[in-house]
């Protein structure tokens, strides 16, 4: 990620209003229902809502983002909810998780077609879950579209193909009130 990207994200997150309520993404809430807490890695955690929500439910969270402003907001949110996720300032172009270390990897609103499959499969333990949701088909056609680069939007059925080495548990493409998405829950093969 370039320094311009880092500055852009810092500016965006510095201007964001602090979260009043702790609200995780619905896809994540559904995906982890009934899953016993373990170690989780959130990539591109932004303001930290998902990371903090997971920590309040007993998960041991490592949350990574390039933006110091986003991580500062995540730290404040965590303090308000009396949890301590480990917040890691890192560029995902260079970040390398320990192998076979996480029961769950979470990615929302982020897409790096080359790097993410490698990071996720490296990080997950056998049987571990990936929960990934990002902008999907139709996003660029929406009147409320804010994306500047269509390269950050999935093609139809692209997300399961990116993670071809994982077992698909559930995949869908959906039009939500504020965005179009591709959503995947996938499992690292057990052996």
Label for each model-derived stretch:
Residues 1-35, 38-46:
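Conserved class I S-adenosyl-L-methionine
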Residues 60-65:
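Conserved SAM-binding motif I beta-strand of class I
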Residues 67-69:
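Conserved SAM/SAH-binding beta-strand->alpha-helix loop
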Residues 81-92:
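Conserved SAM-binding strand-loop segment of SAM-dependent methyltransferases
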Residues 97-104:
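A short acidic, Gly/Pro-enriched loop at the edge of an enzyme's catalytic core
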Residues 111-123:
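A short, conserved alpha-helix within the catalytic core of class I
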Residues 127-135:
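Conserved beta-strand signature within the Rossmann-like core of class I S-adenosyl-L-methionine
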């Amino acid at each position: 990620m370039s320094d311009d990207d880092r500055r852009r994200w810092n500016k965006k997150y510095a201007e964001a209003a602090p979260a009043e309520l702790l609200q995780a993404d619905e896809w994540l809430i559904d995906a982890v229902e009934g899953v016993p807490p373990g170690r989780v890695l959130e990539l591109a955690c932004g303001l930290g809502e998902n990371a903090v929500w997971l920590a309040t439910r007993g998960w041991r969270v490592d949350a990574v983002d390039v933006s110091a402003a986003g991580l500062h907001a995540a730290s404040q949110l965590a303090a308000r909810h009396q949890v301590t996720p480990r917040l890691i300032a890192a560029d995902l172009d260079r970040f390398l998780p320990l192998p076979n270390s996480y029961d769950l990897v979470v990615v929302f609103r982020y897409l790096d077609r080359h790097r993410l499959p490698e990071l996720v499969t490296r990080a997950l333990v056998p049987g571990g879950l990936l929960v990934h949701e990002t902008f999907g088909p139709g996003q660029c056609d929406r009147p409320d579209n804010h994306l500047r680069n269509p390269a950050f939007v999935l093609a139809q059925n692209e997300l399961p193909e990116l993670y071809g080495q994982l077992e698909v548990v559930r995949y869908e493409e959906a039009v939500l009130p504020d965005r179009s998405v591709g959503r995947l829950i996938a499992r690292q093969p057990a052996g």
